[in-house]
Regions:
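N-terminal small-residue-enriched
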Residues: 6-508
């Protein structure tokens, strides 16, 4: 498991779902449906009725569930390094994934050609998971309305190539002007535009359009013989007009400040100690060490530390953890999940009590629960599974300054790089990309080489102070699970953890 690319922070406080007016909501849904039917289905000689007929062929066998997932993705990327654009690429991929489920067994087939023949052959392949002998029924398609939680414009067309390159050069210009110690700048810009159409055996059909943009910045600072790195960036479900000069300057300043701070960093101390985690991106630790363990498949298989603990205390009082896929424009947000269900706000832990899991259709059915709109897949070539969207801890009642001031000795981890977690045990290790030594309630000096080691479920029980500054990351997170990567959001307020964490460093 892993989330990569990280930066902070957009205040969320208590996150409210964004609903448009009824008329705008209806128009947006109609626009999505018409665009997807025209540019994805009709462009490949298909109609919703064609998909229903293929599903009816699957339905002649004894299966519990089946779906067809059609997708067309356009992807563009640009990368600047050493003052020049080193690479630029544009790709279009389309195809179909067909799935049938019988009990705990799943049959899945996909094709990178989208036409009636590839769908028919895929349907014939997967239906053998169930015994033949049912009467065929062609259900009239009934389209499910998704939530209008983000715009639908194609970001690839929102700027021409010259303007995209100019944006990357602007990043370099700002970074080198910020401080003479910045000696190298790397910047990447990616745009994605997905068209999705889902047809299910129960007659439900759903369409979605998913834009996604990301700007990533890395700088190298040099002082004497010492070189240090700083990173920042952001994005979401926007077009490229989102990256205003003001926002780009903010990203650049964050990357530069991190690099310059690390130039002054001393070796991190090592040992058991109290830790304060900053708001925003440090929620990646919550995502990895706790969030994956709250996904339905791990709990159905009894491989999670949270298996069978609904209704039990699993965290300190005040700890409330939520997964919410319908926050406006966020990287992890979706109008519908990849099984055609609306995304939603799912409370997982409430005031320290485990109250629910994230579910897709299959695991929800097998556990006697309802889907929470968390069925996600990387592409048409992958079967869906329960996945996080935007996962965060809600606010507490303490000012972040008060939390730091309460720490006699310990580490304040402002930002994280990579990490690893074992879902079954909950054990994790994360590397801090920016951290400070705190003594007598004051920041003393930055430290380098700090790794945070602990057990996710145990750490939750030792949260002693929760800040009132809950924030989501800036919008560049990518989560990996079972070989599939999907965009996600993470977040939390400032937290003080009094036990259960070991800091690994070079200074004992």
């Amino acid at each position: 498991m892993g989330v990569v690319s990280a930066y902070r922070k957009k205040a969320v406080s208590r996150i409210i779902r964004p609903f448009r007016t009824a008329n705008r909501y209806q128009k947006m849904h109609n626009d999505i449906s018409q665009t997807v039917r025209r540019d994805l289905l009709a462009a490949n000689g298909l109609s919703p009725e064609d998909l229903s007929r293929s599903l009816s062929a699957i339905g002649t066998h004894h299966v519990d569930y089946a779906d067809i997932y059609c997708q067309r993705t356009a992807f563009e990327s640009w990368h600047l390094e050493e003052g020049m654009v080193k690479s630029g690429s544009f790709q279009i991929d389309q195809g179909v994934g067909v799935r049938a489920v019988s009990g705990e067994k799943t049959a899945f087939a996909y094709a990178d050609s989208l036409n009636a023949d590839s769908i028919r052959r895929s349907a014939e392949t997967v239906r053998v998971i169930g015994a033949a002998g049912r009467e065929a029924h062609i259900r009239t398609p009934s389209e499910k309305y998704g939530k209008a939680v983000h715009q639908t414009a194609n970001p690839i067309h929102s700027l021409d190539s010259a303007a995209k390159v100019a944006l990357l050069h602007r990043v370099e210009e700002l970074a080198k002007a910020a401080d003479p110690r910045i000696v190298q700048v790397m910047a990447g810009l990616t745009c994605e535009y997905d068209l999705i159409y889902i047809a299910r055996l129960d007659g439900r059909h759903a369409a979605d359009i998913r834009p996604l943009v990301r700007l990533s910045i890395t700088v190298i600072a040099k002082q004497g013989e010492r070189r240090e790195m700083g990173s920042a960036g952001g994005g979401g479900r926007f077009d490229l007009s989102y990256f205003s000069d003001k926002l780009v300057t903010e990203y650049v300043n964050a990357a530069v400040q991190q690099a310059l701070t690390n130039l002054e960093a001393r070796p991190a101390p090592a040992g058991l100690m109290k830790v304060v985690l900053g708001s925003g991106w440090p929620g990646v630790l919550l995502h990895e060490a706790v969030g994956h363990g709250l996904e339905g498949d791990f709990n159905r298989k009894q491989t999670s530390a949270f298996s069978g603990k609904i209704g039990q205390r699993v965290a300190a009082k005040g700890v409330t953890v939520v997964d919410q896929g319908d926050i406006a424009d966020r990287r992890g947000s979706l109008n519908i999940d990849d099984e055609g269900n609306e995304t939603s706000r799912t409370v997982l832990i409430e005031d320290g009590i485990l109250v629910g899991y994230m579910q897709d259709e299959t695991n929800a059915r097998l556990m006697g629960m309802q889907s929470t709109g968390n069925g996600r897949r990387e592409s048409y070539a992958s079967a869906p599974m329960p996945r996080m969207t935007n996962t965060f801890m809600e606010n507490g009642g303490h000012d972040p300054e008060e939390i730091i001031a309460s720490l006699d000795k310990g580490i304040y981890a402002v930002n994280f790089g990579g990490g690893q977690v074992d879902i079954t045990s909950g054990k994790f290790v994360f590397s801090a990309s920016e951290a400070w030594w705190v003594e007598n309630g004051k920041l003393q000096y930055p430290v380098k080489g700090a790794t945070i080691v602990g057990n996710g479920p145990e750490v939750l029980k030792h949260v002693s102070m929760i800040g009132n500054d809950s924030a989501l990351d800036k919008g560049v997170g990518v989560c990996g699970k079972d070989g599939q990567s999907v965009p996600v959001g993470v977040g939390q307020p400032t937290l003080r953890i009094d036990a259960g964490l070991t800091v690994g460093g070079s200074e004992a």
